[in-house]
Each structure stands twice: as structure tokens, then as C-alpha cells.
Amino acid sequence: KIVGVQSEHADPVYRYYLEGDPDKRVFKPVNVKASVAQAAMIGNPVSMPRVIEVANEYNNTAPEKKIFVVQVTEQEIMDSMMRANRNGNVACTQGGESMAGMKRAVEQGIVKPDETGILDSTAHMLKFLSFQEKYFNDSFEPEFNVNPIEDLKNFPQLVKPDTLEKVPAPGNPLGGKDMEEFVNKMSAEIANILGLEKR
């Protein structure tokens, strides 16, 4: 299965595939609204005829429908990006859109519980860092319709225990007992912040 995903702010492909009967489908460009997934903020994709052709060929080779398109909100895109980043997957806004689309596909029964999904994240999150900062600072412009969730804000945090006297620095590495003390105290502090306990 291939699942396409579009924001409700830029969704001409999604709207095209809303019509279940291929013979009745008519492609209509849309006027896009501000979207965090800027690389996908296209209201009239020039490659749409090719997309339709390839999707039809792919569907025709399978015994059942294999091409799907889902729609997500800007809120879902940003929340998904932040969830991915909190869990160690550095995702851009388009990656957040992919993750939100996978969730929607599961909710709609397109992707079954026993199936595995592969998500496409097209860029490094640093390319779209301003959107993460807007999420942290509650500074999204109203047209994005994004209201940050406090629990998803993953601010960078300085970790330096008060009892730690020596830390490694450029040109000043630690060794021996100093390095051992640094590793032990930093590990203990991180475990404390995360609420981890020894097993």
C-alpha cells in the first residue's frame, strides 16, 4: 500500500481521490493556506497528471486498491513532529506530516494492526527549526491553527550537577578519575531528571 498525506491547508490530491469512481474524478487546483509543511504546500502540482497515471498503473496491478490519500491538520503535523523528536527521531515538518498521516491511515483502517509502515521524512528538522521554536514559544500565527501542547515541548536542558567540578571542553579533555567522575555524575543526574531507577 502507498498512503499519501496532505494538510487540510494544501490538499488538491486528497480532494481528487475523495471521489471513489475513477471515471468521475476531476482534478481542481486549490488556493493553499499557510502550512508548516512548506515543501508540501502546493495547490497545483505540475506532476499531477503523472501521479494519476502511475497511481492507476499501480492499482491496476493489484487485486485490490493499493493507493490511498489521507488528510491531516496543521496541529496534527506539529504534534507528530514533536512526538517524533521527543522519541529520538529527528523529523522535519514533512516528517511530522508523514507520521500524522500514518496515524490517520490506522484510524481509518487503511493500515492494519499487523502491517508495518515506512515513513518518509524529506529533510532534517534544522531546515524547519523556526516551527519548532514557534511550538516551544507559543508564537504560531493564527492562520496556522496550531496550539502547542505543553507536554510535547521538548526544550533543550542544560545538565550539569552542582557537585561536578571538572567538565570536558574543547582543548581540555578529561581523563582517568576526572572522566569517570564526570560520566558517573552526569549519568546519575540524567537518570534523576528522567525518573529512572536501578533495576
Per-range role (PLM):
Residues 74-131:
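Claisen-condensing/thiolase-fold acyl-transfer catalytic domains that form or cleave C-C bonds
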